[in-house]
From Swiss-Prot:
Gene: Adh7
Protein name as it appears in the record: All-trans-retinol dehydrogenase [NAD(+)] ADH7
Alphabetical UniProt keywords: Cytoplasm, Lipid metabolism, Metal-binding, NAD, Oxidoreductase, Zinc
CDD domains documented for this protein: alcohol_DH_class_I_II_IV
Cofactor (UniProt): Zn(2+)
UniProt entry tagged with the keyword Lipid metabolism: yes
Residue positions binding NAD(+): 199-204, 223, 228, 292-294, 369
Binding site for Zn(2+) 2: 98, 101, 104, 112
Pfam families hit by this protein: ADH_N (PF08240), ADH_zinc_N (PF00107)
Recorded GO CC terms: cytosol; plasma membrane
Cofactor annotation comment: Binds 2 Zn(2+) ions per subunit.
SUBUNIT field: Homodimer.
Organism from which the protein derives: Mus musculus (Mouse)
Amino acid sequence: MGTAGKVIKCKAAVLWGVNQPFSIEEIEVAPPKAKEVRVKILATGICRTDDHIIKGSMVSKFPVIVGHEAVGVVESVGEGVTTVRPGDKVIPLFLPQCRECNACLNPEGNLCIRSDLTGRGVLADGTTRFTCKGKPVQHFMNTSTFTEYTVLDESSVAKVDGAAPPEKACLIGCGFSTGYGAAVKTAKVTPGSTCVVFGLGGVGLSVIMGCKAAGASRIIGIDINKDKFQKALAVGATECISPKDSTKPISEVLSDMTGNTIQYTFEVIGRLETMVDALSSCHMNYGTSVVVGAPPSAKMLTYDPMLLFTGRTWKGCVFGGWKSRDDVPKLVTEFLEKKFDLDQLITHTLPFNNINEGFELLYSGKSIRTVLTF
């Protein structure tokens, strides 16, 4: 492209501080350095994790460009890039895969050493590629997709099938893959099992889809918002309940419902109390509980160790357990083969300039996933 090697001026949604709205600004995006890729974003989803930066529950320096769930096309590449080239359709990866560190080399690992889940805010060389009004702007989780152009490390980019529709396939960059993988890859749900999903947002619905695909015979969805039940049932839940409908602890309610046969539970909210509830609700000896929801920073869990002593398994789950560069292209292929339906998760599509409206839909509970298009 004619812009290769040049600074690009473009539009981005910049966050200048905690609890502030996004400001649509003109920014400058520097060319990619060695082993980096500059990507033109085509569509990006709004995820609850982005809101953690707005609310201050995740650490970040400001100003920052957040967003991490997207599809784009490679505009240019830096020296030494071999896995993608200009014109390739790609999904940015908030969880990179360097294919060299211990986690990448272990068949069960996926938390690459190059991950930025702690708010470092810069690329591998310690600098940013974004400038706005003469000030450096921070990156977010190696991705920063709320902008027309972004720069990523080569390890944070997956080449995908060019037929993938950006406004749908972007969900594979985070929300869908995280939930679906929690069931089929992390928990390894077995046919005929009983599963319980705490939290029926977009990721929770994706967990349900994964449980159904794995052959679970009973899938119970839990949420305090009953407006979410219809969609949960549509994607595969067999029944839904609200904790507000009983004075009993939810673990007792579930035990009464199932005869104490729950093999898998999933916490997809990020609340400490619900994490313990989910652990308490799976079978005391052979149950597995998976923490999927991003926990708040600097908080500690308190729980009875007997919950684990009797044999339960408590697992964490980042990006569904997938090895990002290896598995994301496969998931896109499965989507194109109609093995799962992402349309059920997308409730709103808005132009990028309406990003603040998209977050209001998130706060009001009216949206499952809102996708912004450029």
